């Protein structure tokens, strides 16, 4: 990190921030300029359309000196921020139920391609939690198995698919929901 950077911007490089709204505002521009975060994360509340999303991410980058991690939380199924923009993606559990590693990878690749098309370079997925009965109400179709070996097999292929599309993946949840 350059020596002339202040402590505040160095701390900012540890943060990925979310915000309200679907367009750049003076308040958001000021926040980005002041904090200089490592990235931004958009949720459904920020995504109204493909062009709007791409524009918003480009506008965010204009206020930050270093390349941003442009992040989204997208798994398919119940956690699908692009549903209204590009259509629904199947849930991880639905894809896992096929037993096809090729489909696990394709699931990641298709999600990754949609991410890239909208301007994202990071997806907060896949879910690495185990599908225990006690966590079923929170995870439902998001967790693929109660067997760690099966979870790893799905996650490995999903992440390869994201990588094939030029998107970084980030396994979650820590310390865990299941």
Give, region by region, the residue ranges found by the protein language model.
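Alpha-helical segments flanking ligand/cofactor-binding loops in enzyme cores
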Residues: 30-33, 113, 156, 160
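Short, compositionally biased "basic patch" segments
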Residues: 1-7, 172-177
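Phosphate/pyrophosphate-binding betaalpha-module
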Residues: 154, 159-175
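Enzymes and membrane/adaptor proteins characterized by extended Gly/Ser/Thr/Asp/Glu-rich
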Residues: 34-151, 178
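Zymogen propeptides
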Residues: 17-20, 26-35, 47-48
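Boundary/entry segment of secreted carbohydrate-active catalytic domains
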Residues: 2-23, 158
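Generic enzyme active-site microenvironment
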Residues: 18, 71-72, 170-171
């Amino acid at each position: 990190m350059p020596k002339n950077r202040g402590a505040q911007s160095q701390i900012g490089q540890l943060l990925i921030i979310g915000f309200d709204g679907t367009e750049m505002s003076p308040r958001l521009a000021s926040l980005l300029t002041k904090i200089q975060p490592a990235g931004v994360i958009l949720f459904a509340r920020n995504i109204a359309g493909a062009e709007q999303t791409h524009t918003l991410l480009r506008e965010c980058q204009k206020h930050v000196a270093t390349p941003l991690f442009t992040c989204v939380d997208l798994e398919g199924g119940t956690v699908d921020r692009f549903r209204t923009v590009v259509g629904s993606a199947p849930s991880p559990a639905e894809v896992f139920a096929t037993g096809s590693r090729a489909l696990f990878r394709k699931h990641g690749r298709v999600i990754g391609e949609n991410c890239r098309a909208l301007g994202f370079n990071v997806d907060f997925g896949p879910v690495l939690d185990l599908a225990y009965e006690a966590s079923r109400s929170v995870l439902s179709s998001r967790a693929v198995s109660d067997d760690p070996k099966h979870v790893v097999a799905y996650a490995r292929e999903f992440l390869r698919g994201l990588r094939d599309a030029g998107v970084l993946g980030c396994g979650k949840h820590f310390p865990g929901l299941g």
